[in-house]
Amino acid sequence: MGDNNRATLGSDAAANAPDAAAFDKGKGKATEDPSLEMSMDEDEESEENDDEDGGDNLEPISADNIISGGRRTRGKTIDFQEAAEKIQGDDDDEDDDEEFQPNDDDDNMRD
């Protein structure tokens, strides 16, 4: 009776019916095709070479494109309250939409 507690380890898939269905499914050891791996590596190397060649054609930076003057805010104190008040003054134009009176001529059909 001690044989009932012993596990049977068999590699025969037909002997274990539930294992037979699961043998082909799930995460298994993937087979790798070395020819595909080699070609992918070669493609990556050729792309890297293309990037290196494109960097040699850079033009020098023109001094005309460099901004100088009062546009820099680094090191300056900004009064956000004053800026908010200035923006509120600009929003007054949106209130004009409420005062709009359409013409009654639009009700007539035209030919």
Swiss-Prot record:
For bias type Acidic residues, the affected ranges are 39-56, 90-111
Put simply, this protein is called Histone H2A.Z-specific chaperone chz1
List the gene name.
Answer: chz1
Record localization:
Nucleus
Q: Which GO terms describe its cellular component?
A: nucleus
Residue ranges, compositional bias (Basic and acidic residues): 22-32, 76-89
Low complexity biased stretches: 12-21
Reported function: Forms a chaperone-bound H2A.Z-H2B complex that acts as a source for SWR1 complex-dependent H2A to H2A.Z histone replacement in chromatin.
Q: Which Pfam families match?
A: CHZ
Q: What is its main location?
A: nucleus
Residue numbers spanned by region Disordered: 1-111
